[in-house]
Amino acid sequence: MAKLAKNKQMAVLNYIHKQVEDHGYPPTVREICSAVGLSSTSTVHGHISRLIEQGFLQKDPSKPRALEITPKGLDILGVKPIQKEIPMLGVVTAGQPILAVENATEFFPIPPSIQDNNDLFMLTIRGTSMIKAGIFNGDQVIVRKQSTAKNGDIVIAMNDDNEATCKRFYKEKTRFRLQPENDTMEPIFLDNVKILGKVVGLFRDHIF
């Protein structure tokens, strides 16, 4: 009985992988029922729960269909993870704003665990204004493209002069504040600001 249940779990995992590969999103529970020969949705939910417990699947609550196969899940299926790459768009200052370079000439490999790579890009930081947030001169930040931000988010922002900077974002009553994480530096106040993206990760190829 245990072997049969395990075989069904692998069938569920394999079908989820196939649907994601073919369509870009996982199947519904009822579609899984039909595909693997199960009549009860609760049985499928049970298999999914056990696959999550074993580390073969994970849930992303930010997505409507939240199932994702982990690197461990791909490994047990014998599938080699596809190496993902994101564009490196140049240098952005973490001190005074400079023009951001948006011509991708290089690409940076990222782990399979980092999803939505089509919405990510990388910039190299120049300056010391974000050191209290752990972002140092020469670091490369991974940025998710988005045009909005919440107070306290670390963002790449552009002003009306098309100058970009890495700062912590705050919306105040009559203006926007781009706050450095360095006690020796002053915030930047703007009437208008364009958000290019939110910093979601960091890569450093050196140690201090």
UniProtKB/Swiss-Prot annotation:
It comes from Limosilactobacillus reuteri (strain DSM 20016). The record marks 94-95 as: Cleavage. The gene is lexA. Residues 29-49 bind DNA. The keyword Transcription applies. This is LexA repressor. The active site is at residues 129, 167. GO terms for biological process: DNA repair; DNA replication; negative regulation of DNA-templated transcription; proteolysis; SOS response. NCBIfam families: lexA. It catalyses: Hydrolysis of Ala-|-Gly bond in repressor LexA. Pfam families: LexA_DNA_bind, Peptidase_S24. Keywords: Autocatalytic cleavage, DNA damage, DNA repair, DNA replication, DNA-binding, Hydrolase, Repressor, SOS response, Transcription, Transcription regulation. Homodimer. Belongs to the peptidase S24 family. CDD domains: S24_LexA-like (cd06529). GO terms for molecular function: DNA binding; serine-type endopeptidase activity. The keyword DNA repair applies.
